[in-house]
Amino acid sequence: MKEIEEYVRSLGLDAYLVGGAVRDELLGLESKDADFLVPGLDTEGLRAALAPHGRVEDLVVADRLVGIRLHSRDRRIRGLTPAGIEFAPPRKEVSTGPGRHDFEIVADPTLSVEDDMRRRDFTVNAIARRLETGELVDPLGGRADLEARRLRTVSAQSFREDPLRLVRALRFVSQLGFDPDEELLVQMREEAPAVKLVSGERVGGGLAADGMGELSKLLLGSEPARALRLARDTGVLIELLPEFGPAIGFDQESRHHDLTVDEHTFAVVQAAADEGYSLPVRLAALFHDLGKPQAAWRGSDGRLHYYAKPGISERGHDRVGADLAAGALSRLRYPNALRRRVVRIVRRHMFQPGKGDERRARRFLRRNGDELAFDLIDHKHADLLGKRGTEGEPPPLDEIERLLRFREVVRRELSSPHRLRDLAVDGNDLIALGFRAGPQLGRALDELLDAVVDEPALNSRDRLLARAKELR
C-alpha cells in the first residue's frame, strides 16, 4: 500500500485514503483496497487529472457514476493494482421525492472530507487518512468502534441509501468478528425487505474487483454461522434467500439430528469454514438440506424420512435442494461454472464411502471427476461435524474417521486410471477396429474404462484392444 500511496501523491492530487484500507490498516490487517477521496474536483475534473497517467474508466455501481478508476501506465503500480486504483469526489444525498428511498447520491467537490465520511455505511469505514500529512479524519468515532469491535451505522439512512449494506454488515460480523450495536439491529429489522432491491451481482456473483459479492465474502469469513443467525433473526436471510423459509425451525425428528434444519445448516457452514474448505463447498453447505421440508414424508415407523419414495415423495431432499440451490445461485448471478459445481455437490451429498477400498475409490473418482470428488468428501466431512444426536451427543467420530480414511485412499488412487484420457487406447484405435464414431464408440470406451477402473492391470494396449474386439 505504501508504494501505491507514494504513486498517488506523485499525481499531484490532495488525496485521502478511505474505506476498507484505513480500517484494515488500523486493525493491523493487510488490505487489497486502493480507494481515494479527492476533494475539490468533480468527476470530470478527476478524469482530466488522471487521463495523462494511464487508462481511465467510469466507476459505476448500481447504475450510479461514483468515481473514476485509473489503470496506471506504470507497470510496477499496475502489478500492485490489477483492478486499478479508484478515485472519487465527495458525495452527498439529494432528495428526488417524498419517499424515504427517494434520493440519489451526487458528487459535490465543495463538500468537506468530514461531511463525506458522514454519508458512508459504517463508522469503522468512515475514517480517512490524508496522504500528504498522515492526518486521520474520524468525525464519527470509527477508531473507538474499531478498538471495541463494535459495528454502527453512520446514520439511520445508511441501509436506505444502499440496502446491500444489510449483507455487508453481516459480512463484517463473519469476516472481522464485529458485534453489531442494538441500534444497528433495529435498523436491520426495519430495512430487511429492502435487500430484495439489490441486484444479484452485488450480493452473490460479485461486481467488486475480486469478483465476489457480499454473500461469498460472508461465507469465506471465520464466523459465518454467527452472521447467518443474525441474518435469520433480523429477517434479512429470508428476504435474501426465501428458500430458507420452510427450513427455519423445521424439526427433523431424527435420531441423527437434534438440530433444526436451519441450525444444522449453520453448523455445517461453520465447520466448512473451520476446516478452510472452498467457496463451492461452503455454498453447498448453505443449501444442502433446504429440500428437507418439501421432501419429508412420514413412514410407518412414525418418523420423518427425506429420500425419494415412489407414490409418496417423487424426489429426495438432495434433488429438491439441488433445484433450490440452482434457482438461488442463478438469481444471485453466480458464474455458471461455480453454480453447476455447487448444484452437483448438493445433488450428490448423500454418498456413502462404504468400506473405502481402492476399487470403490476409483469408481468414486470415475463417477465424479477429481475436483467434485474432493468437494463431496469435504462437504461430507463438514456435514458430519455439524451433526448432533438427539441427546446432544458430539459428531459421529466413527463416521468421520471412516470418511477421512476414504479421502486418503481416493488421494492415493488419483494416479490410477479413472478417466477416458487415462486409457491405453483411444477412439481412433477403436475406429481402426471397425467401430463407428458416435454412441457405439462412446459406449465401448465407457465399458473399457469401467473394466480398467475395476482392474487397473487391464490398462495395456493389447489387452484393451482384445477386449474391444469382444464388444463389437
Each PLM stretch: what is its role?
Residues 1-472:
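Catalytic cores of the polymerase beta-like nucleotidyltransferase superfamily
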